Amino acid sequence: MLFDELISEFDRGLRSIAGVSRMSRPVPQPAAAAPAELSAAERKHAAGLMRVNHVGEVCAQALYQAQKFATSSSELKEMFEHAAREEEDHLAWTAHRLKDLDSRPSLLNPLWYAGALAIGVVAGRLGDKVSLGFMAETERQVESHLDSHLSELPAADVESRAIVEQMRADEVKHGKTATDAGGIELPMPARMLMRAASKVMTSTAYYL
């Protein structure tokens, strides 16, 4: 059984890196049609932002996989799995949007995935309360990051905006779930380190 789970998670990891993840929910659609075509500069900027969001979802898959295997609680395993499935939708949605924008995922996805997997292993080994606290803080920072993207996306890019809005709603839910399950607040140095690492990732992934 464990071997089957390892094969399944390995497959998920490969799909995350390759950008061929499955979606269980359709791509969110805007309520109204775009008011105008995006200019070349707007398409390039939107693609950079969506590439950053795609990298975030690659990292989310790695984090949840590591945390799922680190816990001995069947309830928490299911919680991490449920969150990972919803994040896999995000991964597929952002990949779909990048293709629509004639762009591509980050060339550094294997590196992002490996780094996030290592962080998830460390968080998981510190115990369930810390692991859940790490999940909650991650989701809070992602929520803030998505808020900034909603303000930065071109006004005419209603397709990307619809995706980001649904992603944000899911992230808020995941963060609350982690807190309700017993996640503790991480110390300020840990939160600052997470923000610094996120800044490096987002600044790099926008271009690469």
Curated annotation (Swiss-Prot):
Reactions mediated catalytically: a 5-methoxy-2-methyl-3-(all-trans-polyprenyl)benzene-1,4-diol + AH2 + O2 = a 3-demethylubiquinol + A + H2O
InterPro entries: COQ7_proteobact, Ferritin-like, Ferritin-like_SF, Ubq_synth_Coq7
Keywords carried by this UniProt record: Cell membrane, Iron, Membrane, Metal-binding, Monooxygenase, Oxidoreductase, Ubiquinone biosynthesis
GO annotation, biological process: ubiquinone biosynthetic process
Cofactor annotation comment: Binds 2 iron ions per subunit.
Binding site for Fe cation 2: 87, 139, 171, 174
Localization per Swiss-Prot or TrEMBL: Cell membrane
Reported cofactor(s): Fe cation
Main location (coarse class): membrane
Domain of life: Bacteria
GO cellular component: plasma membrane
MF (Gene Ontology): 3-demethoxyubiquinol 3-hydroxylase activity; metal ion binding
Pathway assigned to this chain's UniProt record: Cofactor biosynthesis; ubiquinone biosynthesis
Major enzyme class: oxidoreductase
Membrane topology type: Peripheral membrane protein
NCBIfam families named among the record's database cross-references: DMQ_monoox_COQ7 (NF033656)
Functional summary from the UniProt entry: Catalyzes the hydroxylation of 2-nonaprenyl-3-methyl-6-methoxy-1,4-benzoquinol during ubiquinone biosynthesis.
Identification of the protein by name: 3-demethoxyubiquinol 3-hydroxylase
Taxonomic source organism: Burkholderia thailandensis (strain ATCC 700388 / DSM 13276 / CCUG 48851 / CIP 106301 / E264)
Gene, per the UniProt record: coq7
